[in-house]
Amino acid sequence: MVATYGIHWFRQDLRLQENPSLLSLSKKVDQIIPIYIFDLNQRIGSTSKWWLEKSLISLYDSIQKHNGKLNIFAGDPEKIISSILKNSNVKYVSWNRLYDPYSIKRDTKIKSIVTSSKIECDSHNGYLLNEPWNIKNKSGTFFKVFTPYWRHCDCLLYTSDAADESVR
């Protein structure tokens, strides 16, 4: 039987535990290829670089304990992921969503590249209790006042549908 491979793209979620994208991918493939791409289009400060270095070392060690290897790249994520897809037999690509405008635009392009290659692509909420576009008032519009928003979100915390499988 031929093994199925999937790429998990680590970004700001440099952890193996409680990682919904990684959990979902592990149920679909025989082997996960973990990657991290230092996006040269994004500038980060010295404190963030220090945190990133320590976190990548920790993640690298954690993956190594599971007989894996974290593949680290620097450059344009679109080009790097395209190159990996051309040179491998990957069936799935996954990551946890980021919500800043740059990441949304980049991720949309990458998802298009992946799916046009006939490869399944999944992104997951790995940061927030609720997706921003899912929290609306009774009128179907977004909340403008915090207290009603908080009351609505507080109720959602205790429903089984709101809890992600990876944290149950």
Regions found by a protein language model. Give the residues of each.
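Trp/Phe/Arg-rich N-terminal binding region typifying the photolyase-homology
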Residues: 1-156
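Single conserved hydrophobic/aromatic residue that forms the stacking wall/gate
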Residues: 158-168
